[in-house]
Amino acid sequence: MNNKADSFFWNLRQFSTLVPTSRTMRLYRLGLCKPKIVHSNWNILSNFHNRMRSTDIIRYLFQDAFIFKSDVGFQTKGISTLTARRIERLLYARRLFFDSKQSLVPVDKSDDGLKKVNLNHEVSNEDVLTKETKPNRISSRKLSQECNSLSDVLDAFSKAPTFPSSNYFTAMWTIAKRLSDGQKRFEKRLMFSHPAFNQLCEHMMREAKIMQYKYLLFSLYSMVKLGIPQNTILVQTLLRVTQERINECDETCLSVLSAVLEAMEPCKNVHVLQMGFRILVDQQVWKIEDVFTLQVVMKCIGKDAPIALKRKLEMKALRELDRFSVLNSQHMFEVLAAMNHRSLTLLDECSKVVLDNIHGCPLRIMINILQSCKDLQYHNLDLFKGLADYVAATFDIWKFRKVLFILILFENLGFRPVGLMDLFMKRIVEDPESLNMKNILPTLHTYSSLNHVYKCQNKEQFLEVMASALTGYLHTISSENLLHAVYSFCLMNYFPLAPFNQLLQKDVISELLTSDDMKNVYKLHMLDTCLKLDDTVYLKDIALSLPQLPRELPPSHPNAKVAEVLSSLLGGEGHFSKDVHLPHNYHIDFEIRMDTNRNQVLPLSDVDTTSATDIQRVAVLCVSRSAYCLGSSHPRGFLAMKMRHLNAMGFRVILVNNWEMDKLEMEDAVTFLKTKIYSVEALPVAAVNVQST
C-alpha cells in the first residue's frame, strides 16, 4: 500500500511540474472534462524532453487515478468536483481541441500493461490523451446512413458523444426527410421523450459559441425543421449566438442562414437576425460567386427590404446572367416574386431560356413560374403560349387534375389557351367519370370566367356533362358552392333545371342571405337578372326577394377624352348622356340615341316626340384591359354577360378600349368612333357633319 501511495505521489509531482498554473481543468455537470486555455504560448514539449531524458517510460498519469479536490498545481475557483472514486478510464468522453503548440505526445502501450510516451512521434494537431478512450468523430452523413430512426441517433449520442453536437441534429433531420408524415410524427414524439434528448440540447447550448459557424446554422435549421418549439431556451439561445457571430458568415453560411430565416416564424430575435442578414448581404453581395447562393439570398431578403438593396441584388443577378443554368432561369421567377421586385430585364431573359428548354419542364416548375408571373403582374404572351402549347402537345401524358391546375393558373392571369381548353373539354365529354366535387367547381369557374364555351362546337355536350355531374352531388354540396356553380352557368348562358330548383328554395336563399357575405347577395342579384332577361322560359315566373344592392359606382373620373370626341363628332353634349344607370344595377358610360338605320344621331330633346320603335339606343362602354382575355379582344365572362343583357334591354353595345383611345390623336379618335357609331352607308354624311362642327 505504501509503495502504491509513493508511486502515485511521485507521478503527481511529475504532473505538477509539467502543467503550469495557468491551465485549469473544468469539470462539467455531465461528467465531461474540458480544458480552459488561459495562455496559449506555453509549450509542453519545451522542457519535457530534458525532464524525461533519464528515463524512457513514465506511468500513465491517469491510470487507476482518483478524482479529488486539491489545491496543488490547479486553479480551483469555480470548478465543480466529484466525490473520490476509482476510475478505470478517462472521463474525457469527447474530443478536446488544443492548438498545435499544446498538443500532448502520443502514448504507446508496453508489454507490462503500462503506457509509455513515444518521444520521437510527430506532434499532433489535437490533444489526444489516449486512443483507446477517445470516441471517433462521426459525421452527420455517416450517422444518417447507419441509423434508421431519430432514436437511433440519440442512442449513438448517449453511448459516445462527439463534438460537434450539431451532427446529431443534422442527422436526425436527414432521417426525418426520408419518413412519411405519419412516421415523422411518431418519431418526433419518441425523440422528445428520449432520455438523451435533453442532454444533447445541453451540449448544443454549451458548444454554440465554439463550434464552427456553419455547424451552428445547420443545427439551428435542423431544430426548426424537426419541430422543436421556437420559443424554447435552446432555439432562442442559438438565435442569439447566431446574431453575435454573424460576421463569421461566408458564402456557404449565407445560403444556410437564408434557409434558417425562411423556415422560422417571426419573433424579435428572428427580426434582429433578419436585419443583420440584410446588412451583411449589402456588404458581401459583390463577393457572392455561386448563382444558387445568390438566388437563395435574394429569395430570403424579404418583400420589405430597402429598394436600394433589391436593385443591388438585381444588378448582381444581371451580371451573372451568362452563368445562369436552365434551373437558375426557371427559379428566377419565384425568387423575384419572393422579394416582390419586378425586374423586366431579368424576367424577359429568363423567359427566353425557359421557352428554349420547355421540353421536359416539370409541373412544379411551370406552376411556380405562372404563380410568380401573377404575383409580379408580369404578362409575357410568348411565355404563356409556349407553356400552353407544350402542355397541349403532351396532353395525353398529363393527368386530369394537373391540366386543370394549369388552366386555373392561366385563368388567374387572364390568359385563354384556346387549344388546351378545347382538348380539356373533349376529355371531359369523353370521360365524364373523371369529374368529382373537387374539380367541378374550378372547371366551371375557369371556363365561365374566360368565356370559352362561346361559339365552341361541343358547347352543348360539355355543359350537359357538367350539369349532370353537378346534379349527382346536389345532396352533399353546400349552399355557397351551389351558388358559385349556378353563377358560372349563368355566365355561360346555360340554366340547368335541377341545380336552379335546389338553389331557389327559400331555406337555401335564406341561408345565403344570413351569411352577411355581399358577394353572395351580388351573385343572387345576377341570378335574378338572368332569370328575367335571358331565355329561361321555365324559370321566368320565379321571383326572388333580395335586399337592395348599392348602385354600381361609375368611374371617379369618366373618360374625358371619349366625352370630348363624342361632343366633337355628334355636335355637342346634347346628343349623348353620361354615367347612365340602368335597371338590374347596370351602368353604362355614355348613351346615344339614333334612328334604326344608324344614319342619324337624335338630340335628347327630340327623343320624347319620337316613337320608341324608331329609336336605336347605343351604349358606349369604356373598358380596361382586364375586361378582355390577355392579348386578345375576346371579352371575359362578366363583360360578355353584360353585353348580352344590354342587348336584351334594347341596346347596341360599342366597346371603347381605354388604353387604345389614350394613344390616338384627336382626329384619329374621332374617325375611330365614327366608324363604330354610324352604319357604312351613313359614314359620308357623318363626315360632312363632323366637318361642319
From Swiss-Prot:
Q: What are the Phosphoserine sites (modified residues) in this protein?
A: 110, 124, 692
Tell whether Magnesium is among the UniProt keywords. no
Q: Where in the cell is it found?
A: Mitochondrion matrix; Mitochondrion matrix, Mitochondrion nucleoid
Q: Which GO terms describe its cellular component?
A: mitochondrial nucleoid; mitochondrion; ribonucleoprotein granule
Q: Which Pfam families match?
A: FAST_1, FAST_2, RAP
Q: Which UniProt keywords apply?
A: Mitochondrion, Mitochondrion nucleoid, Phosphoprotein, Ribosome biogenesis, RNA-binding, rRNA-binding, Transit peptide
Domain RAP, by residue range, is: 618-675
Gene Ontology molecular functions:
rRNA binding
Which Gene Ontology BP terms does the record give?
apoptotic process; mitochondrial large ribosomal subunit assembly; mitochondrial RNA processing; mitochondrial translation; positive regulation of mitochondrial translation; regulation of mitochondrial mRNA stability; RNA processing
Function per UniProt: Plays an important role in assembly of the mitochondrial large ribosomal subunit. As a component of a functional protein-RNA module, consisting of RCC1L, NGRN, RPUSD3, RPUSD4, TRUB2, FASTKD2 and 16S mitochondrial ribosomal RNA (16S mt-rRNA), controls 16S mt-rRNA abundance and is required for intra-mitochondrial translation. May play a role in mitochondrial apoptosis.
Binding partners and assembly: Monomer. Found in a complex with GRSF1, DDX28, DHX30 and FASTKD5. Associates with the 16S mitochondrial rRNA (16S mt-rRNA). Forms a regulatory protein-RNA complex, consisting of RCC1L, NGRN, RPUSD3, RPUSD4, TRUB2, FASTKD2 and 16S mt-rRNA.
UniProt similarity note: Belongs to the FAST kinase family.
Query: Mind telling me what this protein is named?
Result: FAST kinase domain-containing protein 2, mitochondrial
In its UniProt entry, the species of origin is given as: Pongo abelii (Sumatran orangutan)
Q: Which gene encodes it?
A: FASTKD2
